[in-house]
Amino acid sequence: MDLNRRSLIKGSVAAGVTALFGTAAQASTKVPAKWDESHDVVVIGSGFAGLAAAIEAKKAGADTVVLEKMPTAGGNSIINGGILTATCCPQQLKHGIKDSPELLAFDMLAAGLYMNQPEKVKLVAKSALSNYEWTVKELGVEYNLEVIGQEGGHSVPRYVFTKNGSGSGIVTKELEKLKKMGVPVRPRCYVERIFRDDSGRVVSIQIREGYRFPKAGSGKVKTIGVKKGLVLCYGGFSRDVDYRMMQDPKLVAKLDSTNQPGATAELWRETSRIGCAQVQNDWIQCTPWNSPKEKGMGLGWTFSQSGAAEFGLWVNTAGKRFVDELANRKVRADAIMVEQNKGLHAVAICTEANLKSYNVARPGMLKKLLESGVVKQYKTLADIAADYKMPADVLAKTVETFNKAVKDRKDPEFNRIMNPEQVPLVDGPWYAAEMSPKVHHCMGGLVTDMQCRVMDISTSKPIPGLFAAGEATSGVHGAVRLGSVSYTHLRAH
């Protein structure tokens, strides 16, 4: 027994030493003697954060280029739901909603279990309105001025909708701006290596130009010199099953992701190799409201969140509510997983009368979801019960109790915040859709300071010439990212 234990310890130490020296050798990869091209600022990633960073770099007079490994620009941002937090915006004022940066910061810290960095949270909250205004004045983004939405974990309704109901409403404007500024956004450029010189400064990168995702080794190898700064905006790794399971073993392959196919971990590994500090990589968010009938993000979430979570209710197939429909995403996703482990399913329910805001915010969407079968229409509540094999009497009692909470503006069962525009669920037509969690967002990542400089794991000091923003970084969200805060976060930094 003792011999086996000593052998195990000896073997573990040997493996650890090998891993240590192997890592050190990799980190000291020789800097290329010459470059094929060079730029003042090189931005990796073409989502919200990368494009905003490129705009600001060019405005500051830097020779700037954006590299994107996929065949088209936009990353997850272009398939984003087109919602962003904007405290004290015109839409809030129109609906008489009182809000403040301080309240937003409180909500972010509470949802994040106070694992967020307070200074970053305050910056994001303080910048929410100015970021919204920047997209309007600088980019020309158009928003729906009639409605305001409330995502889970927020104390009040505070998110606005792009007019086209998609993140593409922002991304396309950023791309247009960069084109006018003469900043190239180069697709199919996969970054393989980041090089630091003897002083520790990031000086160049190795890419594969003409890369064909996900074909390893495709494309022509080139080196690019970085004169002033490399900006890492490569996003999360929700599509990388091996890497995400290394961080959180329950996020198995059969669990779908909302992300685009390129949300993989190559640069998470590479930045670790060169000594970048990373924290909280195992805090990976799952959405609660996606449809199991759709692949990836889909569209069904718009009904389950902007319709049923805000103005209807969620029940399990036992006919009972099981969670505050406006709790943060982790609380709701975890609650659905608990129900699924019992052999039950989660169903979002709403009535025509309570979908007025949804239909104004996303005109034509309900029709599209009905045609696809993701959402179904029913004449009566009993019809929903029959279709989902719920006990009709239990479901009826659940809705009756919920309607009393709506009238009283107080939910004793789950303490849900009641939208002032919500009315009791009484008359049909009724609508329902099944929900199932999907892997969505990485809260952890690179450790940066308030100037977005990436920190060195060995010195806890900034790595010269290396910056980062967006989902690739940590510090803003802590344990949970509140919905609709992503662009506010990306642009603020």
Q: What do these predicted ranges mean?
A:
Residues 394-476, 480:
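A glycine-rich dinucleotide-binding beta-alpha-beta segment and adjacent secondary-structure elements
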Residues 488-493:
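Conserved small/polar residues in nucleotide/adenosyl-binding loops
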Residues 196-224:
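Conserved beta-strand-loop-beta-strand element in the redox core of flavoprotein oxidoreductases
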Residues 212-213, 217-219, 225-294:
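Glycine-rich loop(s) and the adjacent beta-strand/alpha-helix scaffold that form part
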Residues 268-390:
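An anion/pyrophosphate-binding glycine-rich loop and adjacent beta-alpha core
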Residues 35-47:
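Beta1/beta-strand and adjacent pyrophosphate-binding region of the FAD-binding site
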Residues 11, 69-184, 188-193, 314, ...:
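Conserved N-terminal/central alpha/beta ligand/cofactor-binding core
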